[in-house]
């Protein structure tokens, strides 16, 4: 049986991510002398920028690290709901669904997970590994088909929130495939971190 994609070979490093710019960020970190943890964190942060409809920098980032001796370390990277939220609230009041809005929000855990991984096993600082993600957010990247489709499907939701509308509906309209998608506030936040 033949694979639908070609087998790729290399002699120095290999990375894989859900967006080619995130993979480029990880590869650049490895080329600069970083290790796999540095590259993984760089890719995770970049995915929060390049896949904003799937991944969120202020979301979750569970991390599994397999060490050279074969042991595995986990960094939970999972956010929590406030203690005041009853465990059965979503079943009782929302039919088992988590509604849009503040009830969907957990305490952001991804930044802590990345920083913890870098402190324990990395060779680079958060600022060094976040450089590409900051650049992608600040300067933008080309809108791709899935992002354009997801923005179209969620247009009404984005329009409801004054913090989301200028990002996902710049100038009051959906960005088209190939247009530049900029997240200046996210770039400033990552730069501050």
Model-derived features with residue positions:
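Noncatalytic scaffold domains of N-terminal-nucleophile
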Residues: 1-24, 28, 36-193
């Amino acid at each position: 049986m033949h694979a639908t994609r070609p087998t790729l070979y290399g002699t120095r490093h290999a990375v894989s991510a859900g967006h080619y710019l995130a993979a480029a960020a990880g590869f650049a970190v490895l080329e600069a002398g970083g290790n796999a943890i540095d590259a993984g964190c760089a890719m995770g942060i970049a995915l929060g920028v390049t896949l904003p409809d799937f991944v969120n920098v202020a979301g979750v980032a569970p991390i599994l690290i397999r060490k050279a001796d074969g042991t595995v370390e986990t960094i939970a990277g999972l956010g929590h709901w406030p203690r005041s939220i009853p465990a059965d609230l979503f079943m009782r009041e929302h039919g088992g669904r988590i509604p849009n809005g503040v009830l969907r929000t957990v305490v952001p855990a991804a930044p802590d997970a990345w920083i913890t991984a870098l402190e324990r096993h990395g060779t680079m600082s958060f600022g060094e590994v976040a450089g590409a993600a900051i650049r992608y957010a600040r300067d933008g990247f080309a809108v791709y088909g899935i992002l354009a489709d997801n923005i179209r499907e969620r247009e009404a939701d984005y329009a409801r929130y004054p913090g989301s509308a200028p990002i996902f509906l710049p100038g009051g309209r959906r960005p088209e495939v190939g247009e530049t998608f900029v997240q200046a506030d996210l770039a400033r936040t990552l730069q501050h971190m």
